[in-house]
Amino acid sequence: MEPIKSFTSTIVALPLENIDTDQIIPAKYLKVTDKTGLGEGLFQSWRYNADGSPKPDFVLNRPDVQGAQILIAGNNFGCGSSREHAVWALQGYGFKAVISTYFASIFNNNALKNGLLPIVVDQETYYQLVSLFDEDPETTLTVDLVNQQLILPEGQTIAFPIDPFAKHCLVNGVDQLGFLAAEEPAIEAYESAHPARVQTV
């Protein structure tokens, strides 16, 4: 998993509420176990016509937003069914962080476990970010995970919360299994020092 400490990127706003996982990635992709290429299916019904041609009026198809790594999304993002593929599709497209006023809990957990940073902001900040994008699509935003803050173009900082363990994993680029593997020597030392507490089959 790629570490996330601090990065600066342009943003893209999709100010729609209740974007569910089926809209993020259609169910037909759920049989896929390889993450490669899932970015092409991101928001498929919104991005493409029936013949596969891109819809020019959809925001992600605009030439001036290509390469954006930060998505600004409406409230209750990632609701609906539990599908890890939704996170994989967002990452496959190139997003490293999604900012919203609220994330569905299962999506939020899937994002953190896979290295996609979900950032919760208040309503005022959300509208401010959407306005920045509307005024200038080339606006850049810095995500400073180490200090848990967003840095706007003119230097304004906005703090955001994150679970301490999730932050540790993201900053160090390790998933939960990787964290446990790194702690194996300490676990073995504890078990050796406290044999009566170790239950064996």
Region locations from a protein language model:
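Cytosolic catalytic domains that perform sulfur/thiol-centered chemistry
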Residues: 1-74, 78-79, 85-105, 109-201
